[in-house]
Amino acid sequence: MEAAIERLWLDDTAWVDVARGWLPDADAVYEEVLARSEWRQGRLWRYERWVEEPRMGAWGPSAQQHPALVDAQRQLERHYRVRFPDGFALAYYRDGRDGQAFHRDRDMKWCENTVIALVTLGARRPWYLRPRANRHAHELENKGATHDLQPGPGDLMVMGGTCQLGWEHSVPQLRDRRVGGRISVQWRWTSRTGRQEVTAGYRAPLRFSRP
């Protein structure tokens, strides 16, 4: 894990670190994680009905079976001087039809100083960032995205500072089953300082009528 980490400043207080090929033997780790994780299909309340989340997820003890990821967590904690007490979560995008819409990780509640680390395994996919000011600009290219980091196997991305306050990120759906599988490994930390988020998170039900 000696890849150089380059910092991209999004504005005065929000940044993203990127290290290409940060995780060694990423293809082997992908196959191991894919085979050994207990994948679950989530559901979201959208458009007045429950819909299946367009990706699979894994969390908890089953995720801790992967020694390469445990070692990666130690490296990240040492470098960023934070602790990830909840371990890591896994998101599996089975093909190009899976994805995740633009969102902020508001469920962390305190978003003014966070560290969210992502390691990508498997196929290279678009990964968009846009300022919140563009969140209604759907007529713009890529729905207002200003950056596409296109992470590939073993790449590390770390969102920090006020990134969860003023920026949104997305793994867009490509509508193409020929795109290979992609796994995102996620670690999250918040300083628990500043103003708490009170708005609903990404997974909260979206209702357009009375419940």
Please describe what each predicted stretch is.
Residues 1-211:
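Non-heme Fe(II) oxygenase metal-center motifs and adjacent flexible, charged/small-residue loops
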